[in-house]
C-alpha cells in the first residue's frame, strides 16, 4: 500500500465518502490550533487539508515504504519521506500529531509510538486512527484500511500506555460497509448517524485521542532497534519545527 494507491483511493467515490465521514469525526478533536505545531504521520494529508484556516504550522511525514507526494498542492513543500522510527525533529517540538494510515502499516507499532512521543511537547495531543479488528473494513481490500494490522481497543490502550500516552477519549467512524455501490455512499451520513446510535462495536475505524505523559521515573525500558535504519535524504538532520502554510 503506497501513496499512489492511497491517492487513487481518496479520488474514488468510496474514498470521498470516507474522507467526509472521518473528517466530521476528527474536526471536534482537532479544535482550534492557532500557532500549534501539527504533524501528520502516515497518509494524513486528506485530513490535514481540512485543518482550520488559522493553522500556521503543519507538516506531513510519510513513511519510507509508502513513498511521498507533494503537499500542499500550492505553496512551499511541507511533506517529507521519513523513517517512522527516527523522525528528523528535535524533542518536544510537536503540539498535535495526527496518525492516519500509519500505525497499522508499520513493522513495529510500539517503536513508532515511542518516536512520536519523543518529538511531542509535554501534554501534546495524539489523534490516532486505525482499522477496527472487529469491523467490516478490515475484512475487505476495497480500501486501504483492509491492509496491515487492525487493532482492538484493548490492544491500542496497551500500546499507548507502554509508549507513555494517556488515552482521554475514544470514538468510532465508518459505519457503512466498504462497498463501491453509489447508493450506499449517498446515504453514508445517515448510516453513520444510525450506526452511532445503535452500536460502534463493528465500525470500520477506531479513533483515540491521547496525551503525552512525562514521568519523573519510568520502570519500563524504551525499545531500541538493532537493525540498520533507512535514512531518507529529505530532512536528514534534526530540526526545530518552524514551518508554515
Q: Which residues are covered by each model-predicted region?
A:
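Short, glycine-/aromatic-enriched active-site segment of Class I SAM-dependent methyltransferases
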Residues: 130-147
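Conserved catalytic loop of SAM-dependent methyltransferase domains
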Residues: 168-193, 201-203
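Class I SAM-dependent methyltransferase Rossmann-like catalytic core
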Residues: 1-32
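Hydrophobic beta-strand segment of the Class I
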Residues: 97-98
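C-terminal lobe and adjacent flexible extensions of AdoMet/dcAdoMet transferase-like proteins
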Residues: 192-245
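Class I SAM-dependent methyltransferase SAM/SAH-binding core
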Residues: 24, 28-87
Amino acid at each position: 500500500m503506497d501513496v499512489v494507491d492511497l491517492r487513487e483511493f481518496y479520488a474514488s467515490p468510496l474514498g470521498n465518502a470516507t474522507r467526509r465521514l472521518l473528517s466530521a469525526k476528527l474536526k471536534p478533536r482537532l479544535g482550534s490550533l492557532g500557532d500549534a505545531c501539527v504533524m501528520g504521520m502516515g497518509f494524513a494529508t486528506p485530513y490535514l487539508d481540512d485543518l482550520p484556516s488559522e493553522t500556521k504550522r503543519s507538516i506531513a511525514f510519510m513513511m519510507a515504504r509508502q513513498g511521498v507526494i507533494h503537499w500542499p498542492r500550492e505553496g512551499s513543500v511541507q511533506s517529507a519521506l521519513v523513517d517512522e522510527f527516527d523522525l528528523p525533529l528535535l524533542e518536544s517540538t510537536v503540539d498535535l500529531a495526527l496518525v492516519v494510515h500509519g500505525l497499522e502499516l508499520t513493522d513495529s507499532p510500539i517503536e513508532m509510538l515511542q518516536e512520536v512521543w519523543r518529538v511531542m511537547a509535554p501534554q501534546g495531543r495524539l489523534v490516532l486512527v486505525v482499522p477496527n479488528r472487529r469491523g467490516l473494513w478490515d475484512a475487505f481490500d476495497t480500501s486501504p484500511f483492509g491492509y496491515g494490522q487492525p487493532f482492538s481497543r484493548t490492544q491500542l490502550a496497551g500500546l499507548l500506555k507502554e509508549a507513555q500516552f494517556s488515552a482521554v477519549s475514544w470514538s468510532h467512524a465508518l459505519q457503512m460497509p466498504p462497498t463501491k455501490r453509489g447508493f450506499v455512499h449517498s446515504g453514508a451520513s445517515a448510516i453513520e448517524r444510525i450506526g452511532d446510535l445503535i452500536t460502534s462495536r463493528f465500525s470500520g475505524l477506531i479513533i483515540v485521542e491521547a496525551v503525552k505523559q512525562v514521568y519523573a521515573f519510568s520502570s519500563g525500558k524504551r525499545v531500541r532497534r538493532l537493525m540498520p535504519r533507512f535514512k531518507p535524504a529529505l530532512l536528514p538532520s534534526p530540526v526545530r519545527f518552524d514551518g508554515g502554510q
